[in-house]
Each structure stands twice: as C-alpha cells, then as structure tokens.
C-alpha cells in the first residue's frame, strides 16, 4: 500500500510540552520556515509603508520562538506558496486585531474595504490616499502572486477570503451564543475557518471535488472544532485583559461561553475547553479511521488531505501555546517587540414636470383684463419659458450605466495613477468623463450593429427606441466635454477632442466594412482598433497626463497601444466562447462583423471568403429592421471554417505574444519610475489568456 511521505520535520513531544502544548496529534514544521518569516516581515513593512496608521506596532504577527504560524499549519505546503500564505495570514491577523477595537458598524465598514480590495473584479473607485485605496494597493501584489502560482485555487482562496469570511464575519456578532453548537457555527465564520480550508488546498495544490468534500466533511468538522477551541484556550488571558483595559470592545470565546451558561469559574471553564479540545482530536482520529475502514480504496490524495488537516490542528495548537501573540501578557516587556522586530522562529414611460404655474383662463398673462384697444394675447403666446425635466434624456444613460461592467477602464485609471499621482478631485472627474463616454459609445455601438443584447440585457435602443437612444448618446458626449471644460485643464480638453475624433474615425471603417462587405487586411483592422478601442485608453491616459504634476512623465504610448489591441482582439476571441450567452451566441457573426479571427481566415484562406460573405449578405443592415440572427447551423459552419483555417490558434498566439509584450512594457515602466505597479499587473492578469479555454472542434458539413 502506498504510504504518505513528508517534507516537513517532526517535532518531538518532549520539545512541544515545554510550551504548555497538550495536543494529542503529531506536530510538524515546514523545512523552509525562513520563507514564511521573510513574507511576514515583508507584510509588516508593506503595511507600515502603505497604511501609515501605526497598527503594525501593536499587533503580534505570525512570528514565534517555535516557528512561523504558516510553517506550522501548512507544513506540507509547496515551498513556493508558503510566502503568500504567510502574507495573507498576517493580513488576517492585523485585520482581526483592528476589528476587535472597533464598534460592530466600524468593523463591518473595514471588512467592506478589505472585501473590495480582495475582489479582482471590483470596479468601485477609491480616492487616492484613502484607506480603501491604500488597502487595494497593499493586497494587489499578493493577489497577483496567488493567481500566478495557481489561477484556479488562487481565485477560489481569494473568493473564500472575501465572500465567505469578510462578508459574514461580523454578522450576528452582537448575539451571544447559548450552546456549543451555536458558538462553533459563529466562530467558524468569525474565526475564518471557511477560508482556512481553501487556503490549505492552495498550499498543497490540491483540488477537491464536492463529492470528496462531502465524504470527508465529518473529519474536517472535528478538525475545525480543535482549531477553534485551541485558539480560545490559549488566547483567553490576552483577550480578557484587552477587554478589561478597554483595548477591545467584545470577547468571543468558548471560555466565556462556559462561564456565562454553566456558571463556571475561569479556571474550570478553561479546563472544560481543554477537555473539549482533546475530545475533538479524538473524534478526528476516530472519524478518520472509520472512513478508512469503510472505504479501503480511498485515494491517497484524500488521505493526504485528511493528514494535513490534522497537522494544521496540531501545528496551530503548538503555535498558540508559544507565540507572543497569545502569550505576551506573561511578560510585559515583550510588548515592545512588534511584528517587525520580534525574534523570528528558530528556522530563521416618463412625463415632463408641470409648468411653474397653470395660467387661469379668466386672466391675462399680466393678471389684468385686456382693454378693448389692446390686442389679446393667445394662450400659446402667454406660456412661460422653463427648463423641462431631464428624465427622458437621462433614462437611457442611467439604464446602460446600471448594467454589469468589467470595470477595466476604471481599474486602469487607478493603476496608472500609481505613477501619475493625479489629485483625487480631478481623478474623480476623469473617471466620470471616461465612464460617460464609454457608456455613450455602447449605446451607439449596439444601435449601429443592430445588436439586441448588451451584457445579457436588452440593448438600450430596444427599450427606448433608436431616436431616443441616439439623442441621449449625443447628449452624453456633450456632457463629457462640458465636465472637462469646467473641471479640468485646457490641455485635457484638447486631448479629449483629439481622441474623440479618432474614435469616430475608427468606427467609420468598422461600419464601412460591414455595410460594403469588404474584408480589411490584418494591418487595416489593427489600425481601426488603435483608433476605436485603443482611442479610449489613450484618451484616459492623455487626460491624466494633462492633470498630473509629475515631471518628467514616462512614455506610455506603447502601453496603451498594446492594451487597446489586446483588449479588442481578446473580446473578438471571447465572442466565440461561452461568455457570449450574455450578448448572444457568436453575435459578431450575426452582426456581419469582420473580427480578428474572420479577418485572418479570409486573408489567408480565400476559399472560405464566399461562405462568409454569402452569410453576411443575408443579415439585415438597416437599423429599423428587427435583428435577425444567423441560424445555429450557419454559425456552427462558419465557426468550423475558422477552426479549420487556424484562425482561433492564430488569435490565441497573437494574444499570448501581446500579453508578453505588455508584461515587458510594465517592467520597463516600473524600472523607469522606480515604483512597482501591482494594480496594473492585476488588471492584466484578470484579462490573461493563460489557461484560457480553447474553442472546441466543430466539423463543418461538406454539403452546400
């Protein structure tokens, strides 16, 4: 029978007992404890540099005389992943400490800031210099490392950190549990256990199916109980003293539960918790053995998962018994040792508003009867001038702005501001202008393409009509220009107007090719992208540069050029992927659009030209004609032609090359500015084609 092997070092029981540790499970420590300590030191330094709130001076981090917390709870972690786990763990510790000293409302607000920062898809804007922006910058590099190491498990871990722990950790925190079952349920949420297990999976590079999770869940439940209660046992004195001194506003502990519900003294309550810990470890072993007996052929992977869960229980227990975080109260002199300086581990329908008044039919406009020799004013002549309601004008704009968004442009603005340092008031105006122009372009694009859907919702012109949509889009352009003229510099206005001309120029060729069924060359298509899609990215950059006081400014031209091309060609490719359910299956084919895969196919394989042009010729090209998509069979055939021509492989290869060029360009700018930009790297990572699903094989029929 294949046996489990270990990279970690076994801690002998005689050594562990010196700290007051009483776990019944074997303890192991990662052989690269130095990596965990280095990551913890980096976190403390990053927090001090970015947050500037001094909180790192009063927080005890993962360091301990017996080893770093992450080295003890993830002893079998892949070495390359240990550092990022330690970094996230210390983020959790300092966040937990801060929350204990806050009211529930303030703690929930701080949870919200960290939740947004840990969301790769978050598009909310934060003012430069705000705590929310500092938090986002602090965690961006860590998130990028997680995704780079293991995209699937990294995103799963970050989602659990954000959506499971932060979203619910302060829920019901004003309610006192009355039973151990209630308490463990609350502590599992508040104590971060729902994120710990995805972190353990990430540490091992181990994906576990839902069926496998269900099979081992009783064992994991026992492990969870052991983890939580060990923390309660060893942290009681610290938390009780912090509550008594006013440093903390509340205490959540099994010791407190037994004091409240059973009337026990503190010593007896702690002894009861100790018995519960030993019982939980015994249950863990019994449930594990029962599973192995009932499932003799259980995969070695699950045995390793269960074994590492047990090692996490014992490692956490050992660390809690020795770490300054839980034991500094024993020696007040250790309070001067913060996480940065403390000795590290031994391993080193809409109507207008009514008029301002209703004219009475028995009076004239001036309120007196007209004389016989004066001409009488007609009612129409007497109506006053007033400004009508803007509801009809604003409704299409509000509709499209409320749709889900990738938020790439807002994220890019925040990332570029790492280098340009535009003041927050002007940055808010820039974001508002870019969002207004982008939404206006979406309204016009859908109308000009006769597209019925936008992000899974009816396109604006379907709901409000063509004319009203055009009118609103035009108004949005006017409003954007007005905002720049009022709030930003003359150079920003010049940049806006010049790039708007480019946007219209690029769109003109996209429309020309569709209307005339003329397929452009690859070079012509890329040039169109540079003006249409790239123009928006170039616009936001040029406006930011006009508002920045940084001198000299780096050359961002190639960055925005590549970003526009990458963004559009990726969108062309993804239109054939499953995300198209939001806009319609292969909607680019319905629109008769010469996207990048089609351009490559027709330019390099003219034998397919007749098929595509014949299909495109059948589509309605007049905006007043209802959109009529190609049949599913037609789209399958054309997709198969693209597949056979190698268009999809070429598109992926093109995107891969551009992604590499973008990474090189970011490196160049970081070296030139002397400032790393994890937010920009994360923005690119969210759009990465690394590991992206390839479009499946579809065989075209040979019949005509």
Curated annotation (Swiss-Prot):
- Known pathway: Secondary metabolite biosynthesis; terpenoid biosynthesis
**Which cofactor does this sequence's record say it needs?**
Mg(2+)
So where does Mg(2+) 1 get bound?
A: 96
- Where would I look for the motif NSE/DTE in this sequence? 231-239
Under PROSITE patterns, the record lists: POLYPRENYL_SYNTHASE_1, POLYPRENYL_SYNTHASE_2
Q: What residues does dimethylallyl diphosphate bind to?
A: 454, 532-533, 568, 575, 583, 593
The record describes its quaternary structure and partners as:
Hexamer.
| Comment block on domains | The conserved DDXXD motifs as well as the NSE/DTE motif are important for the catalytic activity, presumably through binding to Mg(2+).
State the name under which the record lists this protein: Preterpestacin I synthase tpcA
Tell me the gene name: tpcA
């Amino acid at each position: 029978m294949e046996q489990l092997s270990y990279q970690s070092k076994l801690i002998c029981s005689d050594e562990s007992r010196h700290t007051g540790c009483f776990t019944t499970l074997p303890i192991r420590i990662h052989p690269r404890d130095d990596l965990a300590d280095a990551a913890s030191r980096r976190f403390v330094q990053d927090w001090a540099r970015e947050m500037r709130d001094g909180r790192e001076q009063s927080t005890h981090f993962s360091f301990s005389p017996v080893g770093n917390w992450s080295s003890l709870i993830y002893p079998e972690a892949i070495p390359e992943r240990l550092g990022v786990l330690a970094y996230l763990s210390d983020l959790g510790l300092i966040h937990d400490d801060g929350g204990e000293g806050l009211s529930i409302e303030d703690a929930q607000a701080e949870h919200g800031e960290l939740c947004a920062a840990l969301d790769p898809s978050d598009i909310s804007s934060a003012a430069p210099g705000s705590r929310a922006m500092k938090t986002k910058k602090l965690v961006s590099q860590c998130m990028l490392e997680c995704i780079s190491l293991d995209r699937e498990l990294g995103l799963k871990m970050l989602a659990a950190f954000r959506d499971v722990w932060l979203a619910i950790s302060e829920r019901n925190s004003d309610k006192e549990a009355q039973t151990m079952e209630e308490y463990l349920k609350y502590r599992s949420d508040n104590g971060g256990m729902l994120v710990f297990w995805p972190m353990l999976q990430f540490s091992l590079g181990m994906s576990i199916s839902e069926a496998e999770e269900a099979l081992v869940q009783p064992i994991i439940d026992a492990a969870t109980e052991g983890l939580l209660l060990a923390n309660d046992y060893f942290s009681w004195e610290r938390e009780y003293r912090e509550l008594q001194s006013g440093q903390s506003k509340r205490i959540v502990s099994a010791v407190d539960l037994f004091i409240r519900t059973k009337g026990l003294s503190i010593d007896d309550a702690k002894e009861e918790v100790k018995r519960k810990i030993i019982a939980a470890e015994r249950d863990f072993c019994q449930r594990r053995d029962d599973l192995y007996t009932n499932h003799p052929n259980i995969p070695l992977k699950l045995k390793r998962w269960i074994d590492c869960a047990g090692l996490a229980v014992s490692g956490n227990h050992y660390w809690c018994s020795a770490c300054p975080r839980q034991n500094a109260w024993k020696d007040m002199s250790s309070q001067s040792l913060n996480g940065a300086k403390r000795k590290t581990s031994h391993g080193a329908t809409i109507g207008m508003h009514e008029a301002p008044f209703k004219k009475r039919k028995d009076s004239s406009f001036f309120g007196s009867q007209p004389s016989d020799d004066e001409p009488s004013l007609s009612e129409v002549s007497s109506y006053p001038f007033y400004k009508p309601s803007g509801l009809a004008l604003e409704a299409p704009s509000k509709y499209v702005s409320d749709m889900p968004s990738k938020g790439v442009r807002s994220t890019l603005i925040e990332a570029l501001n790492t280098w340009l340092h535009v003041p927050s008031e002007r940055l808010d105006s820039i974001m508002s202008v870019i969002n207004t122009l982008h939404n206006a372009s979406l309204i016009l694009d859908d109308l000009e393409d006769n597209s019925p859907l936008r992000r899974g919702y009816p396109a604006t012109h379907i709901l409000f009509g063509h004319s009203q949509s055009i009118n609103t889009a035009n108004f949005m352009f006017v409003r954007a220009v007005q905002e720049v003229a009022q709030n930003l510099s003359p150079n920003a206005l010049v940049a806006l107007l010049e790039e708007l001309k480019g946007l219209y120029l690029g769109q003109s060729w996209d429309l020309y090719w569709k209307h005339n069924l003329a397929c452009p060359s690859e070079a012509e298509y890329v040039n169109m992208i540079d003006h249409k899609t790239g123009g928006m990215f170039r616009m936001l950059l040029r406006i930011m540069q006009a508002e920045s006081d940084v001198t000299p400014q780096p050359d961002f031209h190639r960055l925005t050029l590549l970003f526009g091309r990458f963004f559009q060609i990726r969108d062309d490719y993804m239109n054939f992927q499953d995300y198209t359910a939001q806009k319609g299956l292969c909607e680019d084919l319905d629109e008769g659009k010469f996207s990048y895969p089609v351009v490559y196919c027709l330019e390099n394989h003219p034998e397919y030209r007749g098929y595509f042009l014949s299909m495109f010729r059948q589509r309605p090209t007049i905006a007043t004609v209802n959109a009529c998509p190609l049949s599913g069979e037609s789209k399958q055939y054309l997709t198969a032609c693209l597949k056979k021509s190698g268009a999809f492989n070429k598109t992926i290869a093109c995107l891969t090359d551009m992604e590499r060029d973008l990474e090189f360009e970011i490196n160049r700018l970081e070296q030139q500015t002397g400032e790393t930009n994890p937010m920009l790297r994360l923005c690119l990572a969210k759009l990465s084609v690394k590991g992206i699903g390839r479009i499946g094989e579809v065989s075209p029929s040979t019949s005509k």
